[in-house]
Amino acid sequence: MIDISTLFSLNKINEKLTPITYIGDVKHSRVFESGRQLLNLLGFKVGVFTDKNLLPENKNDLEIYESWDEVFESSNAIELLRVQKERLQDNEEINFDEYINNYQLTQEILGKSQSDLAVLHPMPINIGIEISKDAIEDRKIKYKDQLSHAIPSRIAAFKYARDEI
């Protein structure tokens, strides 16, 4: 809800592009699943770009991308998700060196993206895993915008649930 509110405030929701592509551990992420459900209710598919071992079992209404170039061609916003080591099962193996090499957002990768890309992150951020140290301060990183929507979004949902709005 907070992420969708942030996307609306940044004018990132439109019919031409996938509203957001999630990058990282979508298999174990509650942020991904709730965002996916809400965007699907609004009539949108969401994108994912991740290691095959971190894809969700249900791939319906997903756009699965194979490269950063595909992500940038199809989405005007991305959300980085941390690998949730504590939720990995014994049979789920992740090679972190390979993961970082393929899926870490770096300044070099950001330089290839569109100038108005919005990069979200639900926090906590693992600098050096899902995002490099040099990329964290880029103007495209919008986690502070997300934080500014957190309380107002929750208040609105609470008031709506109580029929106050």
Map each language-model feature to its residues.
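Glycine-rich phosphate/diphosphate-binding loop of Rossmann-like nucleotide-binding domains
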Residues: 8-81
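A glycine-rich, Thr/Ser-enriched phosphate-binding loop motif common to dinucleotide/cofactor-binding enzymes
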Residues: 1-6
